[in-house]
Design a protein with these regions (language model features):
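His/Asp/Glu-rich mid-to-C-terminal helical/loop segments that flank catalytic regions of hydrolases
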Residues: 252-303
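Non-catalytic positions within long, well-ordered alpha-helices that form the structural scaffold/packing
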Residues: 113-116, 217, 236
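Zn-dependent metallopeptidase/amidohydrolase metal-coordination segment
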Residues: 226-263
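Acidic, Ser/Thr-rich low-complexity intrinsically disordered segments
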Residues: 303-334
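Glycine-rich tight-turn/loop motif centered on a GG-T
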Residues: 160-168, 221, 256-268
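Mid-sequence, gly/pro-rich, charge-dense loop/helix-turn segments that line enzyme active sites
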Residues: 123-213, 218-219
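Metabolite-binding pocket within alpha/beta catalytic cores that recognizes anionic/polar moieties
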Residues: 2-5, 9, 13, 20-168, ...
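Generic hydrophobic/aromatic pocket-lining and core-packing "Φ" positions
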Residues: 109, 213, 229-232
């Protein structure tokens, strides 16, 4: 059930986030240097030690404004000690004002790419569809089944320019490998990790019926949430390496352990919050190492959309579509 309650929990944690990290005396409203790494979620990351809030940005994009201001945090590189900028965005807004289908995912992803972001770590609380994935376990998924209903805008390529991008592997294998290594390094210290799994991304905001929950289990679903899509698809279109980290807070309604309550979910989330912070903090430490620069900059994805998004012949490309995509991909479609 928490899958669908995850946005409630994320909001609760977001309140803690914005009072937990170290703020500079004067936080800037601009940031001129490229930011390669971003976190999407509401997980308390800014309360991690050694993160300093240096800027709060309020960008606009051709697809609207993001779901929250973007916080820029400085994090010392484990390799050099130099500050590494990390962008943080709250998926459901600072005050949890956005339902899952209202999240402006295109604006979120576009704003992050425009900043220079090429790697996204997304965090999501989820419900478990399998007995072996217990509450408080972490899952680094490798697949998604789309059970959204087309309500959410899900592509940058429309209105006069068509683009097709492969989505066989919805999460980035290179970033995923590093995330799994970090998770396994914390096992035995409160972290229990499942290093693959299939997310069912449902539309919401209502919860599943028992029949639906059992159907998802029969399909091989591992966990369920409302957040993975269209976020992962848009990141793929934007040539951004994307990996979600899931934290199980309950069994979905298929389980005979009884109805899930908000109190139960909140209890598990609170009890595991420190493990979540340590996990994501370890991932950011690893990604900040100079040896991973090529992976973090997603050089293996660079230029993919120049071909995949160039399907529409030049005479057929609308001025509006060219302008929007030119903002996202400068120089690609001139």
């Amino acid at each position: 059930m928490l899958t669908r309650l995850s946005h409630i929990l994320n909001n609760t944690l977001t309140k803690d986030i914005h009072v937990g990290f170290r703020k500079m005396a004067n936080v800037a409203d601009h940031y001129n240097d490229p930011v390669s790494i971003a976190v999407i979620g509401g997980t308390g990351l800014q309360s991690l030690p050694h993160f300093t809030h240096v800027a709060t940005l309020k960008p606009s994009t051709p697809w609207g404004t993001p779901s929250s201001p973007i916080s820029i945090l400085h994090h010392p590189s484990p390799s050099t000690g130099k500050p590494i900028p990390i962008a943080f965005i709250s998926r459901h807004g600072l005050h949890h004002e956005l339902a899952p289908h209202e999240v402006p995912a295109r604006a979120n992803i576009a704003a992050l790419r425009h900043l220079g972001v090429r790697t996204i770590i997304a965090f999501s609380a989820v419900g478990s569809l399998q007995e072996e994935i217990k509450p408080r376990d972490f899952v680094v998924p490798d697949q998604i089944i789309d059970r959204t209903k087309g309500i959410r805008p899900f592509t940058f390529f429309e209105g006069g320019m068509v683009g097709h991008v492969g989505f066989a592997d919805p999460f980035d294998n290179k970033i995923g490998k590093l995330v799994r290594q970090c998770g396994h390094s914390l096992e035995g210290e409160g972290v229990r990790l499942h290093d693959k799994g299939t997310i069912i991304c449902m539309e919401g905001p209502q919860f599943s019926t028992r029949a639906e929950s059992n159907m998802y289990r029969s399909w091989g679903g591992s966990v369920i949430n409302m957040s993975a899509l269209p976020e992962a698809k848009l990141a793929k279109e934007a040539e951004i390496a994307y990996q979600m980290i899931c934290m199980s807070t309950d069994y979905d309604c298929w389980h005979d352990s009884g109805d899930v309550t908000v109190e139960m979910v909140m209890g598990n989330m609170k009890a595991n919050a420190e493990n979540a912070r340590r996990f994501v903090g370890a991932v950011l430490d690893e990604l900040s190492k100079e040896e991973h620069n090529e992976v973090v900059l997603a050089k293996h994805l660079e230029g993919e959309m120049k071909f995949a998004g160039g399907l529409t012949a030049v005479p057929g490309r609308s001025a509006e579509a060219k302008e929007k995509l030119g903002w996202l991909f400068p120089g690609y479609f001139e």
